[in-house]
Amino acid sequence: MKALRYYGARDVRYEAMDDPAPQSVAEAVVKVEACSICGSDLHIYHGHGFSEDVGFCVGHKAVGEVIEIGSGVQRLKVGDKVMLPGAVGCGRCRSCLAGVVNLCEFGLSSCYGLSSKLQGSQAEAVRVPAADMNAVKVPDGVSMEQALLMTDALATAWFGVREADVQPGSSVAVIGLGPIGLMAVDSAWVMGAHVVYAIDPVPERRALAEQAGACG
């Protein structure tokens, strides 16, 4: 398959690499239909990565179609449309079941595309560990483009606003209006905010937030 592979600062190449395959009965392979770029990918591109590895595939935001499953996968079947959250856990330990995947007790805690430990999703296909946990079916009526936002950016924004305990009638200030900040504005409205203040030095970003009803 073809993939984007990292070889050093400002050296990312679109080239061939081995097709992924399940490495255990609990894994799946997903054909990538859409992926996107994160600020973390840009850090890696500029040489501020999380590993000394080179030659690995980057990217951790993707949606696609299940094309292969291990015999132990129960919740998915070939042909399912799925979204792949960037963070990966075992799906069985207390931490994963509590939603704190970063504290996975079996050491599976990782993220696609940060090293060769788990190849990224800016490729034609990607291996999904613990697929019952780490691949989420796309609901009917949701486009793949919409689902892609849920793999990282919108989920991050929603989590942040929820942790801020925004209640109906709240006044909310969102500082920083990049993609996640803009989605935090939308999330605050959904949670019932009375007013949302949008703070950013970039006029174009403030204008986008104002289009969503925020006070710039």
Protein language model annotation of sequence segments:
Residues 18-35, 48-97, 139-141:
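Glycine-rich beta-strand-centered segment in the early N-terminal region that forms part
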Residues 92-175:
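NAD(P)H dinucleotide-binding glycine-rich loop of Rossmann-like/cofactor-binding domains
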Residues 7, 19-20, 53-59, 113-119, ...:
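Short Gly/Pro-enriched turn/cap motifs at secondary-structure boundaries
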Residues 11-19:
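Short glycine/threonine/proline-enriched tight-turn/helix- or strand-capping micro-motif at secondary-structure
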Residues 12, 37, 91, 133, ...:
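Short alpha-helical
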Residues 40-46:
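Cytochrome P450 core scaffold surrounding the K-helix E-X-X-R motif
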Residues 140-216:
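Mid-domain Rossmann-like dinucleotide-binding core that forms the NAD(H)/NADP(H) cofactor-binding site
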